[in-house]
């Protein structure tokens, strides 16, 4: 039994079984030589573990392993793959080496177009990824860049495209990497003086998929090598699919020539899902798990959890885990009881003061400007946007929103909401502002 298993056994004896099942059992452990990395499915579990259990985990680890360094991360533990099938090595950020990555084995075949839930927020991204999979290398979508906040489905679409390419052509060399893996592989090649081999290995793929290219910012040599890799693949009509947490031109430290290359193909924003899409996602994920979730429970989660798909999944995991443990049916009352802290945290994260500050900062204003009685266009439009965002992202009533904006009447708030919705249909810049603000508030 390893140090983490022994620590977990002790924690099970010290804490209520229900708490252990909800907060500690979902953790995936990666025990290193002198540290432990715990992967959690969502940020809420990370916060709970950090606040309630981390100090005790460190004490137990020091006792059983002789060290107490513990790192909490969101995601899944890296899965080992067979080194003999690999074209090159890609060490992770935490260890000096990692099993090599094969062309086929590093695509997660769970993520397909069939189980991707389509909505207004991701419709264009889905269509673009599907076209890239159908016609890889076509200049209309090469490179394909999917950008947006965390947990919105960018990686799902990337995997779906890669899996579709391999389904159509089982011999296709489709390589998926996180950006830090590209960086680590390059560093190793530099150290071992095997850069020529490094370049050949990347340039022989049929499709290159790289996640989170914002990680390249400020890394000049990495950007240079990726720039040359990009050019070789593009000239060879090999498909490139990338993701970024924002539009690349907004990433400081990314070279102008690389930003220019990324604009050659198709860039698509993936936005936070709307209510209907969120509800559909909850129901779809529940079906995948074989769980029976009433529609009203899905609607409750969708109404309260507005930020991203990952948080929706986290809420669903917490709900189903407690239901399985207690044997209770999943009802609205059970969901409200189980998710009370999670829902409260969501409400606190997106508050009226937070919205006002975010909008004011975005437009280069002071909060007092948004609350003032002045009606100049430079103030009136941001004020309307702030009120509309508050209606969209919080549970506050129109009168409450009006009160928060210097005592304005509820009809003023209603007019602002309708006005912004109407204007966004025709004003692309306003729509872009709205989407960017949604992303900022959902991070």
From Swiss-Prot:
Per the record, what is one GO cellular component?
cytoplasm
| SUPFAM superfamilies in UniProt | P-loop containing nucleoside triphosphate hydrolases, TrpR-like
Region Domain II, annotated ranges: 67-105
Instruction: Report if keyword Nucleotide-binding is assigned.
Output: yes
Location in the cell reads:
Cytoplasm
Positions of the UniProt region annotated as Domain III, AAA+ region: 106-323
Report the protein's function: Plays an essential role in the initiation and regulation of chromosomal replication. ATP-DnaA binds to the origin of replication (oriC) to initiate formation of the DNA replication initiation complex once per cell cycle. Binds the DnaA box (a 9 base pair repeat at the origin) and separates the double-stranded (ds)DNA. Forms a right-handed helical filament on oriC DNA; dsDNA binds to the exterior of the filament while single-stranded (ss)DNA is stabiized in the filament's interior.
Q: What is this protein called?
A: Chromosomal replication initiator protein DnaA
């Amino acid at each position: 039994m390893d140090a983490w298993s022994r620590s977990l056994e002790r924690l099970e004896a010290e804490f209520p079984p229900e708490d252990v099942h909800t907060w500690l059992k979902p953790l995936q452990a990666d025990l290193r030589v002198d540290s432990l990395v715990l992967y959690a499915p969502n940020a809420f579990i990370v916060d709970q573990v950090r606040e309630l259990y981390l100090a005790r985990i460190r004490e137990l680890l020091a006792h059983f392993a002789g060290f107490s360094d513990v790192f909490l991360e969101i995601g899944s533990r890296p899965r080992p793959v067979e080194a003999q099938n690999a074209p090159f090595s890609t060490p992770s950020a935490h260890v000096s080496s990692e099993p090599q990555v094969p062309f086929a084995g590093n695509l997660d075949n769970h993520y397909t177009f069939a189980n991707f839930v389509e909505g207004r927020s991701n419709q264009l991204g889905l269509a673009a990824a599907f076209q890239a999979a159908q016609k890889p290398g076509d200049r209309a979508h090469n490179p394909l860049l999917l950008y947006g906040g965390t947990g919105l489905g960018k990686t799902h679409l990337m995997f779906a495209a890669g899996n579709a390419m391999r389904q159509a052509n089982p011999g296709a060399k489709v390589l998926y990497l996180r950006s830090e893996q590209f960086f680590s592989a390059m560093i190793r090649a530099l150290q071992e003086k095997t850069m020529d081999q490094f370049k050949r290995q990347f340039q022989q793929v049929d499709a290159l998929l790289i996640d989170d290219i914002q990680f390249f910012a400020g890394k000049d040599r990495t950007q240079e090598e990726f720039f040359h890799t990009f050019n070789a693949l593009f000239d060879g009509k090999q498909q490139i699919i990338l993701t970024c947490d924002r539009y690349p031109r907004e990433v400081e430290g990314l070279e102008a020539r690389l930003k220019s290359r990324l604009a050659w193909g198709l860039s698509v924003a993936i936005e936070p899902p709307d209510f209907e899409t969120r509800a559909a996602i909850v129901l779809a994920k529940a079906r995948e798990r074989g769980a029976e979730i009433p529609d009203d429970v899905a609607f409750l989660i969708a109404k309260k959890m507005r930020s991203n798909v990952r948080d929706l999944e986290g809420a669903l995991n917490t709900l189903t885990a407690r239901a399985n443990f207690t044997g209770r049916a999943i009802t609205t009352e059970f969901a409200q009881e189980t998710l009370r802290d999670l829902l409260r945290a969501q409400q606190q994260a997106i508050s009226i003061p937070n919205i006002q500050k975010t909008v004011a900062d975005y437009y280069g204003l002071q909060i007092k400007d948004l609350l003032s009685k002045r009606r100049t266009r430079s103030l009136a439009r941001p004020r309307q946007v702030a009120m509309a965002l508050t209606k969209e992202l919080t549970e506050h009533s129109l009168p409450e929103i009006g009160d928060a904006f210097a005592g304005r009447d509820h009809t003023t708030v209603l007019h602002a909401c309708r006005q912004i919705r109407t204007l966004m249909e025709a004003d692309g810049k306003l729509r872009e502002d709205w989407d960017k603000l949604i992303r900022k508030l959902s991070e």
